[in-house]
Regions:
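Solvent-exposed loop/turn and edge beta-strand elements of beta-rich ligand-binding domains
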Residues: 1-314
């Protein structure tokens, strides 16, 4: 009868940690290098430091993703509880802890929905905490046999918010005779000229105008350049996924009683505005106004932009 062999492996469970950067809106990996993380060992109460030997030997405590949107620690970690802290997000994304969401009442509007509704409020997310033991789900690298524990860390896309204001000179007061009286006075002048008499009292009208909000003006917002999905995703032909082609209509804005119109959740990029309806008693403004939404850094969840139009009265 053959002997039964049992192999016991008493070596401690050690693993390589793989962090995958994801776009929280599309669910796709972010195919950009540069997301940076620190890994805090909550049991030892210290940050993980590891040694790399290429291109030169050095000790690192910040780990960075590659162009495929992930990183693998160069050395193995032991079983413990770890907190993953993002210290830099890739271009076009909000660093973990600085998120904001667009709310309509209690409902969160998806950042992918371009809309004139909602108010932005802080909605920061906690860092990822993972406890790893020998029972933790893991992968085995087919080439090296190394144990790999994978975690996904999503980021919100940075967005823009445009506020457009429209003003123009509008009559607020008429000094002197009423409009009816003015008409009668003009008729009187004509009569005087016919009969050869002068009955003009010398009273005249002074119209007073003030610059104020224009309601009902309509504008169209277009993409000035092609705007791509910030996650770097590609279509079946290998081309970058496009959100808006150059000169695509992105939104239509109509000013309210305060002369304002807002559009939220615009992808970062360059745009231009055209006025299509001037509002009552105003001349259409032919000026095309351009602007670019660019975040100052990865802590800016929303880039705010203001554009003002002024129209001449008819």
């Amino acid at each position: 009868e053959p002997m039964v062999w049992r192999v016991f492996d008493d070596r401690p469970f050690e693993f390589l940690l793989k962090i995958v950067k994801k776009d929280a809106q599309t669910g796709n990996p972010v195919l950009k290098a540069g997301a940076s993380y620190k890994i805090f060992d909550m049991e030892k109460e210290e940050y993980v430091e590891q040694t790399v030997f290429y291109p030169k030997k050095e000790t690192i405590s910040v780990f960075k993703t590659n162009e495929e949107g992930y990183l693998v620690t160069p050395e193995e970690l032991k079983c413990s509880t770890y907190r993953i802290e993002e210290v830099k997000a890739p271009e076009g994304f909000v660093r973990q802890g600085y998120e904001m969401s667009l709310y309509e009442g209690e409902t969160v509007i998806s950042p992918l929905e371009v809309t004139g509704k909602g108010i932005y409020k802080e909605n920061s997310k906690e860092g990822i905490v993972i406890t790893v033991s020998s029972d933790t789900a893991h992968q085995i690298d087919p080439d090296t046999g190394a144990v790999i524990v994978e975690v996904e860390q999503p980021n919100d896309e940075q967005v823009g918010s445009l506020t457009l204001t429209k003003t123009g000179e509008q009559s607020v007061e008429v000094k002197g005779d009423s409009l009816l009286a003015k008409a009668k006075r003009l008729a009187g002048k004509i009569k005087d000229a016919v009969i050869g008499e002068d009955t003009d009292t010398g009273v005249f009208h002074d119209f007073v105008y003030e610059e104020s909000a224009v309601e009902g003006a309509t504008f169209e917002l277009y993409a000035k350049d092609t705007i791509y999905s910030p996650d770097g995703a590609k279509d079946e032909q290998g081309n970058p996924v496009i959100r808006y082609e150059k000169d695509d209509l992105v939104a239509t804005l109509v000013t309210d009683t305060e002369g304002k119109a807002v559009v939220n959740n615009l992808p970062l990029g360059s745009y231009y505005l055209k006025e299509t309806v001037a509002g009552d008693h105003f001349v259409l403004n032919p000026e095309q106004k351009e602007f670019t939404l660019t975040a100052k850094d990865d802590t800016q969840a929303v880039v705010y932009e203001g554009v003002a139009y002024k129209n001449e009265r008819q």
